[in-house]
Amino acid sequence: MRGAIAIFGDVHGNLIALETFVAATRGRVSGYVNLGDTVGYGPWPDACVARVRALCGTAKGMIEGNHERLHLGADDLARQTPLVQRFYAHAPSRCRDLTPITGLPLLFDLTRYRCQHAAPEPPARRRYLVGHSHRQGPDPRRPDIIHVGSIGQCRSAINRVEWAEMDLASHDITLHSIPYPVDALMDALRAHHYPAECIDYYARKPRR
């Protein structure tokens, strides 16, 4: 495979943000690796899983995140925050078909980097590309770990879509951040009758 690979994660059922990312990378990258948490929160989990599977080609390029584990019952929803439980109590946040997210790998080795959902504990002597934090950039305490950002729920600016790209010739990592219409997502949450506190989660986040 030549060219560049897009490494992305934390779509969180946000099809609008995912399609913004696809449009930005189409024709520029030759492949995709997904770092997990395709599901959870947003109203389009099944559509997002199908889109990500199509991008990655096979399930090998999709990694299990903690929200896949919540969907599968491998992690206990009762131990999550009340807000997470409110999202999960609302039917559109749930996958109807669990088959595509069952048995996903926990990691994917891409040249000199190991791709996995969250930063490893304890650290290992290698380089990592991770999601989970919903933030982007090198880890301030561990520069061997790069956080690629979040497609569907960026913490630093809720109206941004963030991901990383790796040049397969040089192995250089480039970080990308672009805006998307988050108000359209909130309109969809209202149309799907999400509780007010779920919509407020997006509304009160900073933008740029």
Ranges and model annotations:
Residues 1-6, 108-114, 142-144, 171:
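Beta-strand-turn-beta hairpins that frame and shape the catalytic cleft
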Residues 1-58, 208:
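N-terminal active-site segment of His-dependent metallophosphoesterases
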Residues 4-5, 59-60, 125-127, 172-173:
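Short active-site oxyanion
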Residues 7-9, 32-37, 61-66, 115-116, ...:
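Active-site neighborhood of phospho(di)ester-bond hydrolases with catalytic His/Asp-centered motifs
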Residues 12-17, 40-43, 67-72, 121, ...:
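Active-site environment of divalent metal-dependent phosphoester hydrolases
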Residues 20-23, 47-50, 76-79, 142-144, ...:
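Short, glycine/charged-enriched secondary-structure capping and boundary segments
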Residues 51-111, 115-116, 122-124:
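Active-site neighborhood of divalent metal-dependent phosphoester bond hydrolases
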Residues 140-208:
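Acidic, His/Gly-rich catalytic cores of divalent-metal-dependent hydrolytic chemistry
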